[in-house]
Amino acid sequence: MTTPWENHQKLLEDLDRKQKEREAREQRERQEAAEAPLREQALELAKTLVDLTRYRNERNLMLFPFCSTAKAKRIKSIRYSSADGRHWLEVTANYEYGMAKIWDFDILRFALSKAGEVALQVGYFPASVEFSGYECLKALGRNPESGSNLKWIKEGLRRLCLTGYSGNIFRENEKITEIFTLIRANYTDQSGKLERISITFDERLVESVRYSKGLLVIDKTLLCEEAGIKKRLLELVRVSMGREISWTVGIERLQALCAHEGTLKRFKYELKQYALPWEVTFSKAIHNGGNVTFAAEGNAPKGEQ
């Protein structure tokens, strides 16, 4: 049973939190008003052909399991909770089209990369971008004339738009559950070449980039990776390591972060098959199935290989 003093403290904490949220919101509104001319310039540039100097993705999309890593259609939801229980994410598939796949996210990576390039030139990250199927496929290293690739873009956009999310990943207030999708999209396809595609980012992605420096550079080779789990690891491990020389994680948690649906034994076997840009070592543990460490070459701990 809580005491009057504890109730008073809780009330003060809630008032303080609400004041901080209000001040942050007012600051964003003032910033938006000041940046109005840049916004219009950025939105216009985002409709034109822009050469990419680097490829990018949003930090949370790299850290958490936002998509399926399997080639097959996935209907089963992803339910992830952080080790401390403070952050959680549920990913829900559309029954007809299935869950967004990690390869579909290449379309989103391209769109974020283009928006990031616009921000680099103008100083403002646009909330939407436009491009052609040819522009997107060429940037992703795929044959831009291929009918199957153009079909993939249309199917991928549908999965990206219809995959639903709920959780508290993007917000500081962990008590609030948000329900959202990552993008809205439309396209024009009168010639069969997808001459115009428009993607509007969810406000959570936009705010992460504008206010939290959430847009990170990624290696272009990631876009060419065909193995779903390896593709996931190339982003997850790099962002988790940060500037450190290694990253250690429980193998069960890593399996959850990779949205792997098989057994733990199978997941560990698959990990050992990949040629990764880090030294990978496994250590045994009594309760959680053991740990796996990814380390820069020459810095791996001794353990079970």
Where are these regions (language model features)?
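Charged, alpha-helix-forming regions
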Residues: 1-305
